A protein has these predicted regions:
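Solvent-exposed, non-membrane alpha-helical residues enriched in polar/charged side chains
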Residues: 23, 31, 35, 70, ...
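Amphipathic alpha-helical segments used for helix-helix packing
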Residues: 109-131, 179-187
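Helix-turn-helix
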Residues: 22-25, 29, 33-67, 71
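C-terminal peripheral helix-coil segments that are non-catalytic and often amphipathic
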Residues: 1-10, 106, 110, 138-154, ...
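A contiguous binding-surface segment within folded domains or other stable secondary-structure elements
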Residues: 119-149
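Hydrophobic alpha-helical connector segments
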Residues: 85-116, 154, 162-169, 200
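Amphipathic alpha-helical linker/stalk segments
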Residues: 70-99, 147
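Amphipathic, non-transmembrane alpha-helical scaffold segments
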Residues: 27, 69, 73, 77, ...
Length: 214
């Protein structure tokens, strides 16, 4: 039996399905373009050329570049948050923080374009921050901050500020994943897997030192 909500919903047409497909295609292309050029460097001409759409077609789905960029940032947040909230948050605070770190590393490895978008947004959004109604990744960072605050509440961080530790670790992960080619060249290690293993081990060793060797 159809629910009242279903009865009140207009039937899905072929045109609306095609529109959804075009919108998704545009968003997928926009992810690549924004990852490469950032918000400031991505023009409608570049976006349209990559997507095979006219400026008018892009404006049909997104009335401005800001709206398109906001939709891309929302997809980045949704992707990261979906995996984050699926983590097992049982156990002691140190173990919860370790799981979060492992997830951040794995997510970044699987979503390199999203990591590039995040890094570019951090660099470019300084002037927009005072006027932003909602910051990118705000919900996810709040979830992570809670884990670090719980860790601090155990007394094992001493004088270390839990929020600053969160951003030191998260920032190091993002920078490493974005700057891998440069880091690889500087340290003379072209093997991504070997370099990532060393980086992961270093992050966890640093956390153990902060937590008191746990």
């Amino acid at each position: 039996m159809k629910t009242p909500k279903a009865l009140g919903r207009p039937p899905r047409t072929k045109a609306s399905a095609n529109g959804d497909s075009t919108r998704e295609q545009l968003l997928a292309v926009a992810e690549t373009v924004f990852a490469k050029h950032g918000f400031a460097g991505a023009s409608f001409r570049t976006l349209g050329s990559a997507a095979g759409l006219s400026n008018a077609a892009i404006l049909y789905y997104f009335p401005s570049k800001k709206k398109l960029y906001a939709a891309v940032l929302a997809r980045v947040e949704e992707s990261f948050r979906a995996g984050l909230i699926a983590l097992d948050f049982s156990g002691e605070p140190p173990e919860r923080v370790r799981r979060i770190v492992d997830y951040q590393l794995a997510w970044g490895r699987q979503n390199p374009a999203y990591v590039q978008i995040m890094m570019r947004d951090l660099v470019e959004n300084r002037d927009r921050i005072p006027y932003a109604r909602k910051m990118a990744m705000e919900e996810s960072m709040s979830i992570i901050r809670r884990a670090y605050l719980d860790l601090h509440a155990t007394g094992r961080l001493g004088d270390i500020d839990p929020t600053m530790l969160q951003y030191v670790v998260s920032g190091a992960i993002i920078y490493f994943q974005v700057a891998f080619p440069t880091v690889s060249r500087l340290v003379g290690s072209p093997d991504w897997h070997d370099l990532e293993r060393n980086f992961t081990a270093t992050i966890h060793a640093m956390l153990r030192c902060c937590i008191g060797g746990s």
